[in-house]
């Protein structure tokens, strides 16, 4: 029976000049290489990995479609707000927090939006109506889908 311990094995060609020389096992070399490999994996460019190997912690909690709808909604809101405030160069555009609006009732949402957009020079009513209708179709991000 073969033994796997280094102490019980001797080299077939012993080195008489250096009796303290020990046998290096190939598994030790592999073990060392694997520890350095795991360190180098943390420094890899994630964009070069295939999609199946990319870390997807965010999409574990929320599905991609839901996140995409939120992103499209936020981009639409930003574009509409820019269009509403197009005539005013010195006024900063207001921030509309969709998550905070989702927590409110429809009447409170309308009141909040009117307060945020009170300095808007354009007609804000069509934007508010469209935003409220889109918010009804959008689910909250704080409640992940199962």
Curated annotation (Swiss-Prot):
Pfam families: PP1_inhibitor. Residues 1-57 are annotated as: Disordered. GO terms for cellular component: cytoplasm. Residues 21-25 are annotated as: Interaction with protein phosphatase 1. GO terms for molecular function: protein serine/threonine phosphatase inhibitor activity. It is found in: Cytoplasm. SUPFAM superfamilies: Myosin phosphatase inhibitor 17kDa protein, CPI-17. Inhibitor of PPP1CA. Has inhibitory activity only when phosphorylated, creating a molecular switch for regulating the phosphorylation status of PPP1CA substrates and smooth muscle contraction. PANTHER family: PROTEIN PHOSPHATASE 1 INHIBITOR POTENTIATED BY PROTEIN KINASE C (PTHR16188), PROTEIN PHOSPHATASE 1 REGULATORY SUBUNIT 14D (PTHR16188:SF13). This is Protein phosphatase 1 regulatory subunit 14D.
